[in-house]
Every structure is written in structure tokens, then in C-alpha cells.
Amino acid sequence: QNHRLLERHTIFDNVALPLIIEGTHHKQIEKRVHGALDKVGLLDKVKCHPSTLSGGEQQRVGIARAIVNSPPLLLADEPTGNLDPELSMDILRLFEEFNNHGTTVLIATHDLGLISRMKYRSLTLKDGRMSQDPLAEATL
């Protein structure tokens, strides 16, 4: 998987990119980047380059970059693809934490078993039709 990280730049720079584009003040950038990296468990990798990280760590850098500017909506397309089950659950727990802090999280995935463990509303797309998860329908 390609996480669209800038290979010649540090993890700090990769996560800071949206804030730099927005014109955020340098001191605020440092605070927010460190906060985002701390949330994804990579604060100790701030000076590393993407090529030195595992695929799962690169995935989490991408997530940190996506949430560093506190978006109201986070779209995640196959965020757990090619990750082991434990790391997949860690990432879903991160999304749950973001949601608990006011970010709407929309996840597209083929891993229905993983999603079924989450307590939030899920929809299924099958044969071009959207339907509510059967388990959710049973509880309504």
C-alpha cells in the first residue's frame, strides 16, 4: 500500500503538511503535530523518514496527517488493508476516539468481521444497493 508519504521528509514534516498549507503558525504546528503523533503512538518517530517505518507505522502517519487539522469528517478507504488483526483493531479504536471527540468517521472496507465488532451504525453496499447492517436492523 502506498500511504502517499513524502519520502525525503521526516515524519514531522509529513504530518505538518496540511497545517503548513493552511498557514498555521510554527509553534501551533509543532504542538498539533506532536499531539497527532502521540495519538497514533508514533511520537518517538518524529525525526524518522517514512522508509524506516513498517507498513503499519506508515499507515498511522497517514492517519496522523489526516487528523492533525481536526477535520469535521474523516474518510478512510480500506484503512486496515494488509494489516494484522491486532493493528487493525488499534486503528479502529483510534477512529472511535476521533469520533468521540467530534469527528465523523466514514470507513469503506471489505472486512465486515472487523467492522461488526464496532458499536456504531454500519451500512452495507451489495450489488449496487445500500442497506443497513442486518445486526443493526435486528436491534432497531
Name each model-derived stretch.
Residues 85-87:
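Helix N-cap at the start of a conserved alpha-helix in ABC-type nucleotide-binding domains
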Residues 28-40:
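ABC nucleotide-binding domain "signature" region
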Residues 63:
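Hydrophobic anchor residue at the start of the ABC signature
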Residues 74-77:
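Catalytic Walker B motif of ABC-type/P-loop ATPase nucleotide-binding domains
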Residues 49-53, 57-59:
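Conserved ABC ATPase signature
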Residues 68-72:
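A short, proline-enriched helix->beta-strand linker immediately N-terminal to the Walker B motif
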Residues 9-16:
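Short coil-to-helix segment of the ABC ATPase nucleotide-binding domain corresponding to the Q-loop/switch region
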